[in-house]
Each structure stands twice: as C-alpha cells, then as structure tokens.
From Swiss-Prot:
It is found in: Plastid, Chloroplast thylakoid membrane. The lineage of its organism: Eukaryota, Viridiplantae, Streptophyta, Embryophyta, Tracheophyta. Heterodimer of an alpha subunit and a beta subunit. PSII is composed of 1 copy each of membrane proteins PsbA, PsbB, PsbC, PsbD, PsbE, PsbF, PsbH, PsbI, PsbJ, PsbK, PsbL, PsbM, PsbT, PsbX, PsbY, PsbZ, Psb30/Ycf12, at least 3 peripheral proteins of the oxygen-evolving complex and a large number of cofactors. It forms dimeric complexes. NCBIfam families: cyt_b559_beta. One of its GO terms (molecular function) is iron ion binding. With its partner (PsbE) binds heme. PSII binds additional chlorophylls, carotenoids and specific lipids. InterPro entries: PSII_cyt_b559_bsu, PSII_cyt_b559_CS, PSII_cyt_b559_N. The gene is psbF. This is Cytochrome b559 subunit beta. Pfam families: Cytochrom_B559. Belongs to the PsbE/PsbF family. Heme binds at residue 18. One of its GO terms (biological process) is photosynthetic electron transport chain. One of its GO terms (cellular component) is chloroplast thylakoid membrane. It is a single-pass membrane protein.
Amino acid sequence: MTTEKIYPIFTVRWLAVHGLAVPTVFFLGSISAMQFIQR
C-alpha cells in the first residue's frame, strides 16, 4: 500500500520538476544565445 501511495506523488513531482526545468533551461539558453549573437 505504501508503494502505491508514494509512487504517484513521486511521478507527479518528477514530471513537475522536469516540466519546469526543461523550458527554463531552454529559455535561458535562447536568451544567452541572442545576447551572444548581438555582440
């Protein structure tokens, strides 16, 4: 029972972290690339 109760929470947390981290890294990367190209 404990594994079934912890598994969904861990999955949701994993998806939330990656869902927020991936766009943030892409956004910062694109901004740094724009500034690097402008210079």
